[in-house]
Amino acid sequence: MVVPSEAEAWRDSIVQPIPYAVSPAFSELRQLVKQAGADDERQWQESLSRAIEAVAGLTAVDGATLMTSAYDVLAFGAKITRRRGHPPIEQMTVTEPVEGDTASIINPTTFGGTRHLSAAQFVHDQRDAVALVAGQDGRFTVFAWSSCSDMVHAHRVETLLL
């Protein structure tokens, strides 16, 4: 899950207490991005690869990994819940980057498994967030709020990864 930097509302959509809150936030990725184009490109690339591998390792823990749009890791192993006072997600738009594909509006319970449904609910409740889900079925989906359709937009991108 990617949430805006400095935002705190995302906490309303996460079961508390968070089992693996990162405090202070892991900021190595953010710092490395700021150093892009540094004098020693090879060393920078190696440092960036190590930082990415460290964050990728956190995704192996059951639950969501949360980071800011500035690349600070806030938590991992987080359990997503519906935000208090907000309705459950009932429909969303689904698209694929395939020529001739048209958007479909579906019930999110029919799309993927628990990870996909949790991500869709998170974005439904936290409209400034983006969720990236790699499902066990091989699907890779990006969830974001669409102000045009006023609903969650799930964009299946696994065909781009082939």
Where are these predicted regions, by residue range?
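Divalent-cation
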Residues: M1-L162
